[in-house]
Structures are given as structure tokens and as C-alpha cells.
């Protein structure tokens, strides 16, 4: 990364006088401001969920983990590999979102069974795996209630509120977005310190994906349109699950078809 060097030249690291060090900090600040001027054109609002532990119940409330809303006794998705019910990872009541309100529930189910190891057997880290169920359903009555065939149900955390926060694209997306600058290390550290200019790593609604490896948007299987982030799940944030080695998962949605959902994750 040579963004600062191009702008301001190389720095002598030996015996830097105080005045020169002050100028160096000024140069970093100028580079930071110049970077933010460009990145602000791509700023989105993400929403951080406020959660509280809840006794698991079949309901149509927004939640992470726990028990889902079921339309009937056969509505809980079953993994084709182990024949057990999949864990509910997240359920969003779309009428209660802070923005882009719609009817229905968005649900993400994921098989966490380790014997057999369905995650690897079914390549659940890739979108559209058979051991993952992403769907939008309507709620027309009270939820059905069943005893799931699942090893250990995850704790239910109700989403009780949303905190808006500025969110910015990952540097891996700069080329695709036409952002023409190289993110200098000193500027990146300043962004981290001020918590601005970077994608949020934690659980969030909307915003920009935090890519652990590279840009991995799925595409609508009919229209081939790039899908958009609906919800991001970080390892062991609200969900008691680790995606590989501290990975991050993304529930995405097609802009062409709201029922086209996908989920994938990557780790370090």
C-alpha cells in the first residue's frame, strides 16, 4: 500500500524530529479525510440488533436462535443428510424492520449436526446448500407447535430494537465499485480507532457485508442479478455458533425476487 507515499513521499523512520512527526500526523489526517470524502458516497445505514434472552416459544417475533414460527406441523425444515430438524439461526418479522418494511417472515435454518457432519458433507458454507433453508413465509394464524428432532436447541434471543450505524464497503469491493484509492495502513488504523469508514463486523441488518476472504455475493438463480445483504451473522455474537475459524455468514436477497434468499459464510 503506497497511497501516502504517492501523496507525501517516503518518511525517514530514524530520529524523526517532533515537528516532522507532527507533520506526519497531519498528512495521515489529510489522507484520512480524502479517503472518507470518497467513501461517504457509498455509505449505507446498517442496523445493529438489541437482543435479550427469552424462554423459547413458537412465535412470529424477530429473533436469533430458539423456536420458529411454523405454518403447520410439517413446516420445520429437515436436513436431507441427517434427517433431523435444522436449527433456526435467525427469524425477521419484516413488518417490524426499521426500514424497508414488508409482509411476512424471513427465516434462516441451518443444520448444525456433527454426526454426520452435515456442514461439510453438504457444503453449507456455499449459498443454496441443501442443509440450509432460507425462506420468506406469511403468517396467517398462530404458530404450530411441535417437538423438534434436534440435538440441542440454541438459546432464543429476541430482537427488541435496532441501532442505526453508518456502514461502509470492504476494501475488497473497491475495484468493483470504482473506488480508486489504495487504503494505507495508517489510514486504516485511524478508521478502526474512530469506527468509521469500514464495514461493521458484528451481527447487523442491511449495510455492507464484511468479507473475511474475498467478495462472494451469490447471484439470483433465475435472473443472475447480484444479491444484496439482508442480515449478517458473526461467529458467537448473538448466535452460539462458530463458522469455521471465527467466520462470518451472510443472508442475502435478490433485488429481483424477494423470495430468492441465499446464505453462505467464510472464515479465516
Residue ranges and their predicted role:
Residues 3-268:
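Preference for intrinsically disordered or flexible, low-complexity segments
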Amino acid at each position: 500500500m503506497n497511497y501516502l507515499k504517492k501523496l507525501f513521499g517516503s518518511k525517514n523512520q530514524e530520529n524523526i524530529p517532533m515537528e516532522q512527526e507532527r507533520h506526519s500526523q497531519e498528512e495521515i489526517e489529510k489522507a484520512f479525510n480524502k479517503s472518507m470524502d470518497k467513501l461517504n458516497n457509498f455509505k449505507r445505514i446498517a442496523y445493529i440488533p438489541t437482543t435479550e434472552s427469552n424462554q423459547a416459544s413458537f412465535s412470529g417475533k424477530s429473533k436469533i436462535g430458539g423456536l420458529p414460527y411454523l405454518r403447520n406441523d410439517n413446516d420445520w425444515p429437515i436436513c436431507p443428510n441427517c434427517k433431523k430438524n435444522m436449527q433456526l439461526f435467525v427469524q425477521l418479522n419484516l413488518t417490524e424492520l426499521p426500514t424497508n418494511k414488508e409482509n411476512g417472515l424471513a427465516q434462516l435454518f441451518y443444520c448444525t449436526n456433527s454426526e454426520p457432519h452435515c456442514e461439510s458433507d453438504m457444503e453449507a458454507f456455499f449459498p443454496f446448500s441443501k442443509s440450509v433453508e432460507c425462506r420468506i413465509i406469511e403468517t396467517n394464524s398462530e404458530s404450530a407447535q411441535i417437538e423438534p428432532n434436534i440435538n440441542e436447541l440454541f438459546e432464543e434471543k429476541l430482537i427488541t430494537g435496532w441501532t442505526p450505524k453508518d456502514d461502509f464497503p470492504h476494501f475488497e469491493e473497491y475495484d468493483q465499485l470504482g473506488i480508486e484509492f489504495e487504503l494505507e495502513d495508517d489510514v486504516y488504523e485511524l478508521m478502526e480507532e474512530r469506527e468509521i469508514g469500514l464495514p461493521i463486523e458484528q451481527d447487523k441488518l442491511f449495510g455492507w457485508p464484511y468479507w473475511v476472504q474475498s467478495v462472494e455475493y451469490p447471484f439470483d438463480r433465475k435472473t443472475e442479478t447480484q444479491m444484496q445483504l439482508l442480515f449478517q451473522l458473526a461467529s458467537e455474537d448473538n448466535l452460539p455458533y462458530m463458522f469455521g475459524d471465527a467466520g462470518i455468514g451472510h443472508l442475502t436477497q435478490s433485488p429481483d425476487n424477494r423470495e430468492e434468499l441465499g446464505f453462505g459464510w467464510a472464515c479465516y
